[in-house]
């Protein structure tokens, strides 16, 4: 019954804000048409608003879960029009706070301690309130030196899980209906969108997980002059309550306060871009909700000329697969070099596009997207916009994107927005390019490869005894002709020649890999004998021969 009433309310809101065109061509359209006479007409003020603004207002009226839905939907620029996405980014996740005494009870249940024991003080008036949780100021009991440390406690809203479950169930039903009946369902992919929203909200409901995210990010940026991450107080953290060191700073979009504090905004903007690319390509762990409200600037007067960001809210973090990380970095470098052919090839090699796509068509599409940008002043070029438009054009060729890449698009857009607000003349290309080049150089250096091999030494040692037997078995199959093909035509002759070349490449690659394994084993065993630097000479010889074999295999593509 509650679901029916909730669906009825959603229908009324859709009609009042004139959003029924979104369901055009579906059975829901007929029901909405029948209900239209019984719903008050939109005011003249609403009627003149753009479709994006009307959708934003409707989501705000439907409540905090739908606000969160709109915020997540704003990241799906591959699915919704740009004007609607821009409007949805204005959604503010601010709601009326719940009772402070209720927050106190939730903290006590979560920690298994009375608040008066766990904390020296706990302010029942929240510092901030959002749809999932709210934040309270507190102090810890005195430490050995008698110091009472200031902290903030993030507390989940009461009954929030039940409310989210009910709204998500309703969204799943609506998504199924749209998928079955909407003429553009294959492009919109409604069930995929709802599943993504459900996953994001589920992650935000576990504050212990958020604490783990903060802890990992802090470890990556320990001692950095570019980014500070508050410490997690694990003794006072549980699934429904997260305690963090209290930090003080200036919101990154409060330009007046930044100027009053004497902050070097130009240096700060460049740091923001560098931090983002380092998180993505060095750490593979990036803050994926990096809007201005979650990025503060350290207000310490001593940091005016060397400013530092402070990260807040770690509910949504992003990670890429190693393949996506590599292909994305190569894509950016191809954009820098205006190598449209390479862009097209990378989209196919990454598995984002079907292998039967014509590379020359994709190359022409990439050129049509990028060339107009290259005619603009450098301060107006947006890598995020180029990437989004590339992916949007590629949709015509059945583009398949992982949710993490979509999350990265949104984060890059936010970071560029923050950077340009701090420094309108920020040349993102000039800042990003050397960072990418350095990270790629370090990532694929021989020293790093050897270090990674040594980390995997136990696994290599476990499987190494089986390798000769497996290689011998495979080669024996080739010699005995178990994969021979009876050639009957010139096309099959060409295929046979290709297979022979492939066979030679595979054998060369296996040999090269084996030699690299030997190099790693020798490096890990620290044998007696000559050393070059800290690496045994025989490791250099074996590793060099293995690298040469792999290079030969690669060149024979």
UniProtKB/Swiss-Prot annotation:
Pathway named in the protein's UniProt entry: Cofactor biosynthesis; ubiquinone biosynthesis [regulation]
GO molecular function: ATP binding; protein kinase activity
Positions of the catalytic residues: 289
Membrane topology of this protein: Multi-pass membrane protein
Subcellular compartments: Cell inner membrane
Major site of localization recorded for this protein: membrane
Enzyme class: transferase
InterPro entries the record matches: ABC1_dom, Kinase-like_dom_sf, UbiB, UbiB_bact, UbiB_kinase
Residue spans crossing the bilayer: 506-526, 535-555
UniProt KW keywords: ATP-binding, Cell inner membrane, Cell membrane, Kinase, Membrane, Nucleotide-binding, Transferase, Transmembrane, Transmembrane helix, Ubiquinone biosynthesis
GO BP annotations listed: regulation of ubiquinone biosynthetic process; ubiquinone biosynthetic process
Domain Protein kinase, residue spans: 121-509
Binding-site list for ATP: 127-135, 154
SUPFAM superfamilies named among the record's database cross-references: Protein kinase-like (PK-like)
Membership in a protein family: Belongs to the ABC1 family. UbiB subfamily.
PANTHER family: CHAPERONE-ACTIVITY OF BC1 COMPLEX CABC1 -RELATED (PTHR10566), PROTEIN ACTIVITY OF BC1 COMPLEX KINASE 7, CHLOROPLASTIC (PTHR10566:SF113)
Name of the protein: Probable protein kinase UbiB
UniProt source species: Xanthomonas oryzae pv. oryzae (strain KACC10331 / KXO85)
């Amino acid at each position: 019954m509650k679901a029916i009433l909730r669906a009825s309310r959603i229908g009324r809101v859709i009609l009042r804000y004139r959003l029924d065109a979104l369901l055009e061509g579906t059975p829901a359209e007929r029901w909405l048409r029948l209900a239209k006479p019984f719903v008050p007409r939109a005011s003249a003020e609403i009627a003149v608003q753009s479709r994006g603004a009307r959708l934003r207002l409707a989501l705000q009226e439907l409540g905090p879960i739908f606000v969160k839905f709109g915020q997540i939907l704003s990241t799906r620029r591959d699915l919704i029009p740009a004007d609607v996405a821009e409007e949805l980014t204005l959604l503010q996740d601010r709601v009326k706070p719940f009772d402070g005494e209720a927050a106190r009870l939730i903290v006590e249940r979560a920690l298994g301690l009375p608040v008066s024991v766990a904390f020296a003080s706990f302010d029942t008036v929240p510092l901030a309130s959002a749809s999932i949780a709210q934040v309270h100021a507190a102090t810890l009991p005195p430490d050995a030196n008698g110091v009472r440390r200031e902290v903030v406690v993030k507390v989940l809203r009461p009954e929030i899980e039940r409310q989210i479950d009910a709204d998500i169930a309703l969204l799943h039903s609506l998504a199924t209906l749209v998928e079955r009946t909407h003429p553009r369902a294959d492009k919109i992919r409604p069930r995929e969108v709802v599943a993504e929203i459900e996953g994001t909200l589920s992650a935000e409901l576990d504050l212990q997980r958020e604490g783990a995210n903060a802890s990992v990010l802090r470890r990556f940026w320990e001692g950095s002059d570019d980014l500070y991450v508050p410490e997690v107080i694990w003794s006072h953290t549980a699934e429904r309550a997260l305690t963090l060191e209290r930090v003080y700073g200036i919101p990154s979009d409060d330009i007046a306060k930044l100027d009053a504090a004497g902050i070097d905004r130009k240096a700060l903007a460049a740091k923001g871009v560098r931090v983002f690319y380092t998180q993505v390509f060095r750490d593979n762990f990036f803050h994926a909700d990096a809007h201005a409200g979650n990025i503060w600037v350290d207000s310490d007067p001593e940091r005016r000329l060397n400013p530092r960001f402070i990260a807040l809210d770690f509910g949504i973090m992003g990670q890429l697969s190693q393949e996506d990380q590599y292909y994305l970095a190569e894509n950016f470098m191809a954009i820098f070099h205006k190598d449209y052919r390479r862009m097209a090839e990378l989209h196919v090699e990454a598995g984002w596009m079907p292998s039967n796509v014509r590379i020359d068509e994709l190359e022409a599409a990439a050129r049509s997207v990028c060339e107009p940008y290259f005619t603009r002043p450098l301060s107006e070029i947006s890598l995020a916009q180029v990437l989004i438009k590339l992916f949007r054009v590629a949709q015509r060729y059945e583009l398949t994107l992982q949710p993490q890449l979509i999350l990265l698009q949104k984060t890059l857009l936010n970071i560029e927005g923050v950077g340009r607000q701090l420094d309108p003349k920020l040349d993102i290309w000039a800042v990003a390019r050397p960072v990418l080049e350095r990270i790629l150089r370090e990532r694929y250096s021989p020293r790093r490869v050897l270090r990674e091999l040594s980390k995997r030494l136990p696994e290599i040692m476990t499987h190494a005894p089986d390798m000769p037997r497996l290689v011998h078995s495979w080669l024996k199959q080739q010699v005995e002709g178990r994969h021979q093909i009876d050639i009957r035509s010139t096309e099959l002759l060409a295929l046979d020649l290709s297979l022979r070349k492939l066979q030679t490449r595979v054998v060369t690659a296996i040999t090269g890999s084996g030699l690299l394994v030997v190099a790693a084993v020798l490096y890990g065993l620290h044998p007696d004998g000559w050393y070059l630097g800290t690496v045994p000479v025989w490791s250099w010889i074996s590793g060099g021969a293995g690298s040469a074999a792999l290079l030969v295999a690669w060149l024979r593509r």
